[in-house]
A protein has these predicted regions:
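Structured segments of extracytoplasmic/periplasmic soluble domains
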Residues: 53-61, 71, 87-94, 109-113, ...
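Mid-chain, structured segments of secreted extracytoplasmic proteins
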Residues: 74-104
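Extracytoplasmic/secreted envelope proteins and their assembly/folding machinery
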Residues: 47-55, 65-69, 81-85, 103, ...
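Active-site-adjacent substructure of cysteine-protease-like catalytic cores
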Residues: 99-158, 164
Length: 212
């Protein structure tokens, strides 16, 4: 997965108002998963940063992003879905990826307590010149935190100041990517990495603890 160095905030700003009058403003649902907000350290480490947030959420890891680069096989061209699955399993989590995932399947995963990492397109330089459906050079990993009837909400590692959102129809247009594998180019569609652990965070930020 290729990662641009220009960081683009999904949905214009972290949970800011929609621009057009009459459009319902996105509001983070009360049942949103309290996934920790992690900022990726470079343009190609969004996969490792997304996994880091998930590991923190399941309370199985206390290290940093750089400690996951080897486990996930992250290189200058990014992280593969297989690498994210491998990294999650290395820390005792159940993980797998799947293509052609539906919105209903995402909702079922969230309702069942799973964390989900999506592989989408982001950061368009000139979005008016090429529709999302034709873009594959701007792959980016985000962690799904909630869904409602109009929006998907994410922990986006390119942001770092709050959660982000995308309208569901737009998500369906952006939800694809490609990977250069040894066997050739793999064009994936609606790919998601599903991760489950035993001890999820109850809230974020967590309760106060004394400084050691």
């Amino acid at each position: 997965m290729r990662k641009g160095l220009v960081l683009f905030i999904l949905g214009a700003a972290a949970l800011s108002a929609c621009g057009r009058a009459g459009t319902r403003q996105p509001v983070l649902p009360r049942n949103a998963l309290p996934v920790p907000i992690i900022r990726q350290s470079s343009g190609h480490t969004c996969g490792a940063a997304a996994l880091l947030a998930v590991l923190y959420y399941w309370q199985v890891y206390e290290g940093n992003e750089s400690g996951l680069l080897g486990a996930t096989g992250t290189a200058v061209d990014g992280t593969t879905p297989q690498g994210i699955v491998k990294g999650a399993r290395e820390y005792g989590l159940a993980a797998y990826y799947k293509e052609m995932v539906t919105i209903d399947a995402l909702q079922a995963a969230l309702s069942g307590g799973e964390t989900v990492i999506l592989d989408i397109q982001a950061w368009p330089d000139k979005p008016e010149e090429m529709p999302w459906a034709k873009r594959r050079e701007d792959g980016h990993y985000v962690v799904l935190t909630a869904l409602d009837k109009e929006y998907a909400y994410f922990m986006d590692p390119s942001v770092g100041t709050g959660y982000t959102y995308i309208k569901l129809p737009e998500l369906m247009e952006r939800w694809h990517d490609y990977e250069n594998l040894k066997g050739g180019v793999w064009n994936n569609e609606r790919l998601a990495v599903f991760v489950r652990g035993k001890t999820p965070m109850k809230e974020y930020p967590a309760a106060l603890t004394p400084t050691q």
